[in-house]
């Protein structure tokens, strides 16, 4: 039976912890993990890491560091996410909306794919989004999906005109009206 890759939770907010665990692998084997995602401009970003399977046939990113030459070093369960780079090194990660991101994770042994899975990170599924156009005031309100009074946060974009949809949605998911 091939090794099994579990990423928990399968669906989570972008600021929640993840557990990447491979089980059922041959102790001492060297496995490669590649994680990829597309940004809002449909550019692919990816990270890679090489691990030695422990004596119990497990790789757990909460307990093990990747081998040298990986995208990150040290024990870091979120290393596969923050260490992603684009094929074009001058590119910036583009988010045009607060849509969920679907990641693809592949495990390889000796260059051959042995298992894969997908997982999703979102900015706040449980929020309402409302456009505001009142005279000279234009904006977007993000709020929890209930009618309870909530503390408010105002997000102001800088001179670059950055889109703050993701930040607004994420804060609303934590109980703020933004």
Predicted regions and their residues:
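N-terminal cap/lid segment of alpha/beta-hydrolase-fold proteins
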Residues: 3-13, 18-29, 42-55, 92-151
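Beta-strand-rich binding/interaction modules
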Residues: 29-35
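Ser/Thr-rich low-complexity repeats and stalk/linker segments
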Residues: 35-85
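Glycine-rich phosphate/adenylate-binding loop and adjacent beta-alpha elements
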Residues: 75-100, 159, 173-176
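Conserved binding-pocket/active-site segment within a compact domain
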Residues: 141-142, 156-157, 168
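Active-site glycine-rich loops that stabilize anionic/oxyanionic intermediates
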Residues: 150, 157-162
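Hydrophobic beta-strand anchors of alpha/beta hydrolase catalytic cores
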Residues: 153-155, 178
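Short amphipathic alpha-helix adjacent to the substrate-entry channel of hydrolases
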Residues: 163-178
